[in-house]
């Protein structure tokens, strides 16, 4: 049977059961089928690498690149200022908690949508007393390079409020690289801004800045980490 017909039939059944209350499990199964069609899976344990390197903001994503240092987008960091408290920690079914205070925000001087945040090492709210950021996350390493058709994964927090701030992983391939821009076909949604684009070795290639939320789209975009961008980031990693 055609897979699209199955998905449409399941979706129709899900609508019916949501009204009648017959079987809520059908709704969950339908969502799982839809996610499988997009090559998207929910991360169950965010305490293991590479998932413990991807942190949740209130409506976006970031990832750890060094001691007390997080990469995200300018359009994410513009909503914050030094001294603000953020839920910069991996989240999910086994999230480790902790709220941290921002020490500095450094935007990339070019047009590229990259921002580096440095945070206080000790949690100021939630989590055990004296909760240490670096003991509960793992920083990513830079990939040496990347090329078209390389397999990639994107990890982040799509539709965070709707998905209860759970972490998801999507997979795909690189479709093109031009200057500082990388296009890929892994499925992304609002909330994936600031997600890392990783190669098969879980090394970071770039940071997601936008997409059109369409299966198979080749126009989802990330800032590609060129030597110049890597150098900027490296200079802002806390020593």
Swiss-Prot record:
Residues 1-36 form the signal peptide. One of its GO terms (molecular function) is serine-type endopeptidase activity. GO terms for biological process: proteolysis. It comes from the Bacteria. GO terms for cellular component: extracellular region. The keyword Protease applies. It is found in: Secreted. InterPro entries: Peptidase_S1_PA, Peptidase_S1_PA_chymotrypsin, Peptidase_S1B, Peptidase_S1B_tx, Trypsin_dom, V8_his_AS. Keywords: Hydrolase, Protease, Secreted, Serine protease, Signal. Pfam families: Trypsin (PF00089). Induction: Positively regulated by agr (accessory gene regulator). Belongs to the peptidase S1B family. This is Serine protease SplC. It comes from Staphylococcus aureus (strain NCTC 8325 / PS 47). The lineage of its organism: Bacteria, Bacillati, Bacillota, Bacilli, Bacillales.
